[in-house]
């Protein structure tokens, strides 16, 4: 295996002059306050090593990366029947598109667009009060990261609740089609809080390890999902994890990955490790601009692309 610390150091050095590229997510007021001149990257390998560079210990809002963890929980609750309510195909449209949802009669294209993630939150909410469902997610993230210090940023959750009009529209639209079972306010309470989970690159890389190691956290030995389910979650991350930029990410990076508008990306190198990168400036489709470049550089220098080197 390549000297991963040297690889990370070289990526950081090459990207340092470009810090601040992209545009922070200004439609969520709390995210608009984030300093764009930050960059962190961490790799957690299946043999238990952690390598990091830059602002890798600074917590940030993981936003849509949380959809990976909620999908894992939902599949654990209802299994394959989840796919009666959510599709598995790339969207080709913006992550908060209503047009596609109307055309497909309230069935979201995949669990990583906002509508799909809201439907997944509805599944996790079943049998719970909203506070309990939020607690279940937080316990799960702490479990897979083996870190009890991970928290939810209430300011971010409140900020999203106050400005999330499009998400309210999506949820009400699905409710009208019978694809949301609980009160919309309860479902979105869960959704906004899951997006407000705050983690560092180091914590996030560790949390993703179960997807790199056939469903088991290799550091703790905890079995999280079956190898088959880990493989299928990775497949969805590869095809749908970057909204309408998913094909471009697969082309340039070649790894399963999930982005968030907080500027984070979680990527998985199956059998090798989990990678988290954070740079708040986003490209035009809402993915971290420098984060994607950093992962492309990493894949090129390590040969980790799932399509070969």
UniProtKB/Swiss-Prot annotation:
<dbReference type="GO" id="GO:0006537">
    <property type="term" value="P:glutamate biosynthetic process"/>
</dbReference>
<feature type="binding site">
    <location>
        <position position="243"/>
    </location>
    <ligand>
        <name>substrate</name>
    </ligand>
</feature>
<feature type="binding site">
    <location>
        <position position="114"/>
    </location>
    <ligand>
        <name>substrate</name>
    </ligand>
</feature>
<comment type="similarity">
    <text>Belongs to the glutaminase family.</text>
</comment>
<dbReference type="InterPro" id="IPR012338">
    <property type="entry name" value="Beta-lactam/transpept-like"/>
</dbReference>
<feature type="binding site">
    <location>
        <position position="64"/>
    </location>
    <ligand>
        <name>substrate</name>
    </ligand>
</feature>
<keyword id="KW-0378">Hydrolase</keyword>
<feature type="binding site">
    <location>
        <position position="191"/>
    </location>
    <ligand>
        <name>substrate</name>
    </ligand>
</feature>
<feature type="binding site">
    <location>
        <position position="167"/>
    </location>
    <ligand>
        <name>substrate</name>
    </ligand>
</feature>
<feature type="binding site">
    <location>
        <position position="261"/>
    </location>
    <ligand>
        <name>substrate</name>
    </ligand>
</feature>
<feature type="binding site">
    <location>
        <position position="160"/>
    </location>
    <ligand>
        <name>substrate</name>
    </ligand>
</feature>
<dbReference type="InterPro" id="IPR015868">
    <property type="entry name" value="Glutaminase"/>
</dbReference>
<comment type="subunit">
    <text>Homotetramer.</text>
</comment>
<dbReference type="GO" id="GO:0006543">
    <property type="term" value="P:glutamine catabolic process"/>
</dbReference>
<protein>
    <recommendedName>
        <fullName>Glutaminase</fullName>
        <ecNumber>3.5.1.2</ecNumber>
    </recommendedName>
</protein>
<dbReference type="Pfam" id="PF04960">
    <property type="entry name" value="Glutaminase"/>
</dbReference>
<dbReference type="GO" id="GO:0004359">
    <property type="term" value="F:glutaminase activity"/>
</dbReference>
């Amino acid at each position: 295996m390549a000297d991963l610390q040297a690889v990370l150091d070289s990526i950081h050095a090459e990207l340092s002059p470009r810090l601040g590229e992209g545009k922070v997510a200004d439609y969520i007021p709390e995210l608009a306050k984030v300093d764009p001149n930050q960059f962190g990257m961490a790799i957690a390998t299946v043999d238990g090593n952690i390598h990091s560079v830059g602002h890798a210990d600074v917590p940030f809002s993981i936003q849509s990366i949380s959809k990976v963890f909620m999908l894992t929980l939902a599949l654990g609750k209802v299994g394959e029947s989840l796919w009666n309510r959510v599709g598995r195909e790339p969207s080709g449209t913006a992550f908060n598109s209503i047009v596609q949802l109307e055309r497909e009669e309230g069935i979201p294209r995949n669990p990583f667009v906002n509508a799909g993630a809201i439907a997944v939150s509805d599944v996790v909410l079943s049998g719970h009060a909203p506070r309990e469902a939020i607690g279940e997610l937080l316990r799960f993230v702490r479990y897979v990261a083996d870190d009890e210090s991970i928290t939810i940023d209430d300011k971010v959750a409140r900020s999203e609740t106050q400005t999330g009009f499009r998400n309210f529209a999506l949820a009400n639209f699905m409710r009208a089609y019978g694809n949301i079972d609980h009160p919309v306010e309860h479902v979105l309470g869960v959704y906004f809080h899951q997006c407000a989970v705050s983690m560092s690159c180091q914590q996030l890389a560790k949390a993703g390890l179960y997807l790199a190691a056939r469903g088991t956290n290799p550091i703790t030995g905890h079995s999280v999902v079956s190898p088959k389910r880990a493989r299928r979650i990775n497949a969805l991350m590869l095809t749908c994890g970057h909204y309408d930029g998913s094909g471009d990410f697969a082309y340039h990076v070649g790894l399963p990955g999930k982005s968030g508008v907080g500027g984070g990306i979680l990527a998985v190198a199956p059998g090798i490790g989990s990678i988290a990168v954070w740079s708040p400036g986003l490209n035009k489709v809402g993915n971290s601009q420098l984060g994607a470049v950093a992962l492309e550089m990493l894949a090129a220098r390590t040969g980790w692309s799932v399509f070969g080197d």
